[in-house]
Amino acid sequence: MENNKKQGVLLVNLGTPDSATPAGVRRFLSEFLHDKRVVNLTRWLWCPILHGVILPIRAPKVAKLYQSVWMDEGSPLLVYSQRQAEKLQKKLQIPVALGMTYGNPSLKTGVEQLMDQGVEDIIVLPLYPQYSGTTTAAVSDGLTKAFKQMPVIPSYRFIRDYYAHPSYAKALAESVRSHWDKNGRADHLVCSFHGIPKRLADEGDIYPQHCEATTELLAAELGLSADDITMTYQSRFGREEWLKPYTDETLESLPSKGIKKIDIMAPAFSVDCLETLEEISDQCKETFIDAGGSDFSYITCLNDRDSHIDMMAELVALYR
């Protein structure tokens, strides 16, 4: 049946602090870590730990990290996400808005921006190629919460994941080849994905399967053997076991295996952010070099590359 309703696209990402200050970071972390999708501990146990220990200690430290990657226009995640929305709108010629699960602009703000332009049917594209309950499902939760505050809600379709879309692997491969053309090719390619607690995967989260498939599809696009590429998980915190192998431990071990030069990328991140620009580019590089590595080269996220925008347009076209 033909859809006669005016359509729009809501691009969604995780979110970012409004400022690289302890207060700004504390507000963001508080909202983020209050979500049961992120930390599903009993509230009476978790909230005192969060507000009494984690936020007072972590906010000032994380603020300094944000300051090291902050751009003139603001947070890298927000800047690149805004560029994506602008380019996608220009390509599709329909309204495109940006919403964040945590922080600003909120999901509610993004939806209202579209509805103010007469949009009645929204295609929601969470910019998480691999599904996880900690990220993608949190977007669905956030939309439901936003809709509860609206007298009239739009119809909408939800793109759950796109790790298997051919244009996604092609865009990743193109970014790798472009990096190789400019910087030369290292001995080995490391694909570092954001981790989740192993317990969540044991309970049924399909994220690790999507990450493994992504790595296999990328290797196929690049013509790499299993010996040429390694998949790891980063960003763990707390004492709980997370998905393995861990990125930092893997980087420590590679030089002893004769792998002294590596390229590293973060396929789960649609835009560069703190976890890529600071954790990978700085911390992981230091870990690898200290372990005996000689050459560490970070391959940037897809950000607002034309191939990335083209892929988004192809995804949206499936729902128009």
UniProtKB/Swiss-Prot annotation:
It holds the Pfam family Ferrochelatase. This is Ferrochelatase. Its EC number is 4.98.1.1. PROSITE patterns: FERROCHELATASE. Its main location: cytoplasm. GO terms for molecular function: ferrochelatase activity; metal ion binding. Catalyzes the ferrous insertion into protoporphyrin IX. InterPro entries: Ferrochelatase, Ferrochelatase_AS, Ferrochelatase_C, Ferrochelatase_N. It comes from Vibrio atlanticus (strain LGP32). Belongs to the ferrochelatase family.
